[in-house]
Amino acid sequence: MDPGSTASPLQCTAGFPSKNRVAILAELDKEKRKLLLQNQSSTNNPGASIALARPNMNKDFRDHSEQQHIAAQQKAALQHAHAHSSGYFITQDSAFGNLILPVIPRLEAE
């Protein structure tokens, strides 16, 4: 930086992250185009459809093993909650990833 420059050192370093971001975005765009080209070539190649059918079986197996793992985690969490709490809990799928949910009784209005 020359003495006649009015830019502060902070302003010079502030531009660096934006250049870095541009480089990262360019690299991501390049990868995206590469993947799109690979996807197009695999759909044009009839032999590729056979290879694409296999991962679904692996996915089903993985989903099943994940469900078993979650069921084991739910059972352990439920046992722990019942042992250490006076409340009542149930296992239920939760949009927030909770393995167990507390049951809260409804009281009639007096």
Curated annotation (Swiss-Prot):
Q: Which gene encodes it?
A: inip
Can you name the source organism? Xenopus laevis (African clawed frog)
Q: Which domain of life is it from?
A: Eukaryota
Task: Give the protein's recorded name.
Answer: SOSS complex subunit C
- A GO-annotated cellular component: nucleus
What is one Gene Ontology biological process annotated in the Swiss-Prot or TrEMBL record?
A: DNA repair
| Keyword DNA repair (UniProt) | yes
- Principal localization? nucleus
Q: Which keywords does the record carry? A: DNA damage, DNA repair, Nucleus
Report quaternary structure and partners: Belongs to the multiprotein complex Integrator. Component of the SOSS complex, composed of soss-b (soss-b1/nabp2 or soss-b2/nabp1), soss-a/ints3 and soss-c/inip.
Q: Which family does it belong to?
A: Belongs to the SOSS-C family.
User: Which locations, inside or outside the cell, does it occupy?
Assistant: Nucleus
What is this protein for, i.e. what is its function? Component of the SOSS complex, a multiprotein complex that functions downstream of the MRN complex to promote DNA repair and G2/M checkpoint. The SOSS complex associates with single-stranded DNA at DNA lesions and influences diverse endpoints in the cellular DNA damage response including cell-cycle checkpoint activation, recombinational repair and maintenance of genomic stability. Required for efficient homologous recombination-dependent repair of double-strand breaks (DSBs).
Claim: DNA repair is one of the keywords in the record = yes
